[in-house]
């Protein structure tokens, strides 16, 4: 494709924001034979910066400049212009754009400098920067062209670890904003507790459950062996403890906001848990989540049998659930998001289009595409490109 040369004017307006500025500027340009090629506007701390690129007849340059300066005087703003012969074909929409989202509770200049440096080192160019959230976390989104996602991801992972910030990279295009399936772990992700620990406390066996958990972490037991051993310690507990434990569960801050916002935007929310359907079913009803899988406790004659009934929901089963729920909703696996914190979540995090480690163990963070270290589950929304204005914060 050949170059297209045109005489252009780049207009930069800055000043205190107030109603009517944009209207006045374009009214000043309206009498001339002008084509608008590009326009950008941002307001930060009540300061407006408006840039406009126009194509114009070179003979009209002085008249346009005079009218623009008169407009600036009326509005009490500054207007600077740059006129030049420009290859406007290079201004067309770029392919292969990447969205780089930086998430942190406190954004420092050094972190931004290193993010920008990593983008440059990956042969990327920053096309735009937008703040999508300011409190309780800060989210900044960079639109990047020219960089290879794999190379950029590798360099930014070092920046994230160095500065203790969270960074996610996603390609631009329709896939980023299509219907998604978001699958969540439960214990220490959707809720703040570990359900098996709550049940063990009712049996006075908390210390024994902890010993089994530590043995599993040392690799001496796999998840199924560990789960069955821990559930066996619950044998003889009255069925009524399930309701007691349900009353002790608290949602992770931002969990309700996350689920409600995703539902309102047309996405599907699913849940998988190494815990128990007996305990989490009322919570699923409360959150209006119909797609969920968890283990089932054996109950006979009003007591826990100390057994797990049916299929064990281990890491492989969690990944399979992701595929199954996606197929049921006719959602491509590339449009899925998996969120979890433990080793049992690794397979689903690897299988998903975007795997997110939430306040996770180091091995899980290393395996995930992105991570969230802030204590708010709804921070995940920013990694999905959903701005603060679209989020139901009244539910937090």
Place the predicted regions along the sequence by residue.
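Active-site pocket-lining segments that scaffold enzyme catalytic pockets across diverse folds
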Residues: 146, 187, 256
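C-terminal cap/substrate-recognition subdomain and adjoining C-terminal extension
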Residues: 236-354, 358-396
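Long, charged amphipathic helices and adjacent flexible linkers at domain junctions
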Residues: 83-91, 167-180, 213-239, 295, ...
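Conserved active-site and cofactor/substrate-binding residues in soluble primary-metabolism enzymes
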Residues: 16, 20, 24, 59, ...
């Amino acid at each position: 494709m050949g170059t297209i040369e045109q005489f252009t004017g780049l207009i930069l307006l800055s000043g205190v924001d107030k109603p009517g500025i944009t209207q006045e500027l374009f009214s000043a340009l309206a009498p001339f034979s002008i084509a608008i090629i590009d326009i950008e506007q941002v307001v930060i701390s009540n300061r407006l910066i408006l840039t406009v690129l126009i194509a114009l007849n070179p003979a009209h340059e002085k008249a346009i400049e005079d009218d623009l300066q008169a407009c600036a005087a009326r509005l009490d703003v500054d207007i600077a212009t740059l006129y030049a012969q420009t290859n406007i074909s290079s201004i067309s929409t770029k392919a292969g754009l990447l969205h780089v989202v930086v998430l942190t509770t406190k954004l420092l200049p050094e972190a931004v400098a290193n993010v920008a440096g990593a983008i440059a080192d990956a042969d990327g160019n920053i096309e735009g920067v937008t703040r999508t959230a300011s409190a309780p976390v800060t989210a900044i989104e960079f639109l990047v062209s020219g960089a290879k996602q794999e190379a950029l991801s590798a360099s930014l992972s070092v920046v994230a670890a160095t500065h203790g910030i969270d960074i996610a990279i996603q390609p631009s295009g329709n896939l980023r904003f299509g219907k998604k399936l978001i699958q969540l772990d439960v214990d220490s992700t959707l809720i703040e507790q570990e359900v098996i620990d709550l049940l063990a406390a009712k049996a006075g066996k908390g210390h024994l459950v902890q010993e089994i958990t530590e043995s599993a972490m040392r690799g001496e037991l796999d998840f199924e062996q560990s789960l069955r051993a821990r559930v066996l310690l619950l044998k003889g507990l009255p069925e009524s403890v399930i309701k007691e434990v349900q009353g002790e569960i608290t949602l992770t801050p931002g969990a309700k906001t996350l689920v409600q916002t995703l539902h309102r935007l047309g996405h599907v929310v699913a849940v998988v848990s190494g815990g128990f359907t007996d305990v989490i079913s009322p919570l699923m009803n409360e959150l209006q989540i119909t797609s969920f899988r968890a283990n089932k406790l054996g109950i006979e004659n009003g007591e826990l049998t100390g057994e797990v009934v049916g299929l064990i929901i281990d890491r492989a089963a969690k990944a399979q659930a992701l595929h199954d729920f996606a197929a049921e909703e006719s959602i491509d696996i590339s449009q899925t998001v998996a969120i979890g914190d433990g080793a049992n979540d690794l397979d689903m995090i690897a299988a998903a289009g975007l795997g997110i480690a939430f306040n996770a163990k180091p091995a899980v963070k290393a395996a995930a595409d992105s991570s969230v270290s802030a204590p708010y589950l709804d921070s995940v929304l920013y990694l999905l490109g959903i701005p603060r204005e679209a989020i139901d914060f009244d539910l937090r």
